[in-house]
Amino acid sequence: MKYISLSSGSCGNCHYITGRDTKIVIDAGISGKRAIEHLAMHGQSMDGLDAILVTHEHIDHIQAVGILSRKFNAPVYATEKTWENMKRHVGKIKEENVRVFRRGETLGIKNIEVGTFEISHDAVEPVGYTLTQGNQKISVVTDIGHVS
């Protein structure tokens, strides 16, 4: 797997992970244009994007979720409470592209297994993710403020 941080910090968070034939964005808290341009600087494209995973509902994590979902017909994964608190900010997303899960649930996105886990943050139901493909693992944890 390959990990690219497109942006991190209070100005916006956006992470891109690719593995074999799978493309995943974790958080899209920058403009869609900026995310696409930053990824292109790394020689990558979001064409064929398989999933957008959301850690929590703060705007610096969801700004372009709707734009990227619509442009690339990508499903958006979020916990139920996160989805309920973010849906009015992301615009219209196809019903079949809304994927709600419970913290602790394991998701399958093509050939990548995605573990979800609770994190500490001032959001309604924040999560971190561990992506596993073969013997490779990448974990993404944001905005925790302390090691838990």
Regions found by a protein language model. Name each.
Residues 4-6, 11-14, 57-61, 65, ...:
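Structured catalytic core of nucleotide-sugar glycosyltransferases
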Residues 7-8, 28-30, 57, 81, ...:
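Active-site metal-binding loops of divalent metal-dependent hydrolases
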Residues 32, 62, 86, 126, ...:
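Short, well-ordered alpha-helical microsegments
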Residues 32-79:
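Active-site metal-binding motif and surrounding structural segment of the metallo-beta-lactamase
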Residues 7, 51, 99-102:
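Beta-strand->loop->alpha-helix junctions that form or flank phosphate-binding loops
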Residues 80-135:
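Metallo-beta-lactamase
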Residues 53, 115, 140:
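Conserved Rossmann-like nucleotide-binding pocket used by diverse enzymes
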Residues 1-42, 127-143:
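Conserved beta-strand hairpin/beta-sheet module of binuclear metal-dependent hydrolase folds
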